Regions:
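Flexible, low-complexity junctional segments that flank or bridge functional domains
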Residues: 1-280
Length: 280
C-alpha cells in the first residue's frame, strides 16, 4: 500500500505558473478500455505520495554550457542488448518505450513538425508491418523529434555504408559543393580530379536530389541547415568497397569520373560530420 495526497498534486497542477504544458492522462479514467479495477488503481497511483523519490525514473546530470543539466534515467527498463532483429512484441515495446519517454519527459514535443499524438499510431503500424528493418524504423521514429540531440548512435554504417569517398562537401542552397580537401587518408592509384567549388551533380547515376529524399527521413535535426549538413555526409557513402561514379560540374562543364572510397573507422560518424561539414 502507499499513501495518496490528491489535494497536494491538484493544487500544484492548478497553478499556471508551474506548468506551461500538461500531459493528457485522461485515458487512465477510461473504464471501458481498462476495466474499472485497473482504472481506479491508476487514478490512485497518480496521486501517490512520492516523498522517497520515483522508483521508476531517476535523474542523471551532465555538464553543458558551464552548468549541470538533469536528464531522466529509466533505471527499470531492460536494455535487451542481444536483440539485433527483434520480433513483433519487442518492436512494439520499442515504440511504446520511446513514445512515452518523449510524451512525459521531453519538453519540446510541442515543437515537432508532426503532432506527437500522431506518431504513436503510425509507428505501431510500421512496426507491426515493417516496410524496412527494425533499425530503419527506429531511426525514422527518432527523427520525428527534429532534434539534433536525438541520435541513434549505432547503425549508421548499416543504413548508409561503411565506405565513403574521402571528400568534404557542403550544400550551397540546394547544390552540393566541394568545400575542402578531405583529411581522411586513402590508399589509391587513382587521384580524384575534384577542386574546391565543384558541384556534385550525381552519384552512381542518381541525382543528388534522390539521395536527399532517401536520407532525410532518418536524420533528426532542428533546422534545415543541419539537415543538409548531415545529408551531405551520407550522399558519398556506399556499402561496397569499390570505386563509385560521380558526375560533377565545373565552370559550366559537366564531367564524369570514378572516385575511390575508404573504409571509415568504427567510431567514424557524427563527430566528424559536425567538425568538417558545413552548409551555407
Amino acid at each position: 500500500r502507499y499513501k495518496t495526497t490528491p489535494e497536494k498534486y491538484e493544487k500544484i497542477l492548478a497553478s499556471d505558473s508551474v506548468f506551461e504544458h500538461r500531459t493528457d492522462i485522461g485515458w487512465i479514467r477510461d473504464t471501458a478500455t481498462l476495466g474499472r479495477e485497473l482504472s481506479e488503481r491508476l487514478v490512485r497511483l497518480r496521486s501517490a505520495d512520492r516523498t522517497a523519490g520515483n522508483r521508476y525514473v531517476s535523474q542523471t546530470y551532465y555538464e553543458t554550457y558551464d552548468q549541470w543539466s538533469p536528464n531522466p534515467c529509466f533505471d527499470g527498463e531492460k536494455p535487451y542488448y542481444d536483440l539485433s532483429n527483434p520480433d513483433y512484441g519487442y518492436r512494439l515495446l520499442t515504440v511504446f518505450r520511446f513514445w512515452n519517454m518523449v510524451e512525459y519527459f521531453f519538453p519540446s514535443k510541442y515543437l515537432t513538425d508532426k503532432d506527437w499524438n500522431d506518431v504513436l499510431p503510425e509507428y505501431i503500424r510500421r512496426m507491426a508491418h515493417p516496410t524496412g528493418s527494425y533499425l530503419r524504423e527506429t531511426r525514422r521514429m527518432i527523427a520525428e523529434l527534429d532534434d539534433n540531440h536525438a541520435q541513434y548512435g549505432g547503425g549508421i554504417f548499416e543504413l548508409f555504408g561503411r565506405y565513403r569517398v574521402p571528400l568534404n562537401t557542403g550544400f550551397v542552397e540546394v547544390r552540393l559543393i566541394v568545400v575542402t580537401p578531405d583529411t581522411v587518408p586513402v590508399k589509391s592509384e587513382r587521384k580524384a580530379p575534384f577542386q574546391v567549388g565543384d558541384e556534385i551533380v550525381a552519384v552512381e547515376d542518381k541525382p543528388v536530389e534522390y539521395y536527399m529524399a532517401q536520407t532525410r527521413e532518418f536524420i533528426s535535426c532542428s533546422n534545415e541547415n543541419d539537415v543538409l549538413a548531415a545529408t551531405a555526409d551520407q550522399i558519398l557513402r556506399t556499402k561496397e568497397n569499390r570505386p563509385i561514379s560521380i558526375r560533377y560540374r565545373r565552370d559550366g562543364v559537366t564531367r564524369d569520373t570514378l572516385a575511390d572510397v575508404t573504409k571509415m573507422p568504427g567510431h567514424f560518424g557524427w563527430n566528424y560530420l559536425w567538425k568538417y561539414h558545413k552548409t551555407f
